Amino acid sequence: MRLTDLLPEMMNIDPIMRETEISGLTADSRRVEPGYLFAALPSATENSGTDGRDYIEDAVARGAVAILAPDGTTVETPGENAPCVITDENPRWRLAQFASRFYEKQPRTVIGITGTNGKSSVAGFTRQIWSVLGETSASMGTLGLDADGFDAGPSLT
């Protein structure tokens, strides 16, 4: 997908950069692959101490071709490998827009399960019931991502 497909309303970027091919999106610099857009998001809370802008250099070294960052962010990467820098006053919201365009197929229904005990069990039972009924479903939580033909264990718990 071209950068211009992700942000048709933001034509204030260099015309040459508009045609940059984007092969993926991530806000984790460790997951950047060549052709990715890296979202250098600021810390969600004042006390978290993590700021995505601190990892821009790493993302570029891993092959990021575009950087999404808060207004006022500058990136010093001279040469042919300089990424396209997109700034926005609300980069989290902009990343959500990009993701909805990049990952076009969205589920019709999303169901959340809350509570203190039994969430994973309820999710598992519900998936089994829907499977018997011929419905496609997936479960994402502390036990990882579980979907037909795809199984990924937990990564952040």
Place the predicted regions along the sequence by residue.
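Phosphate-binding loop of NTP-binding sites
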Residues: 93-157
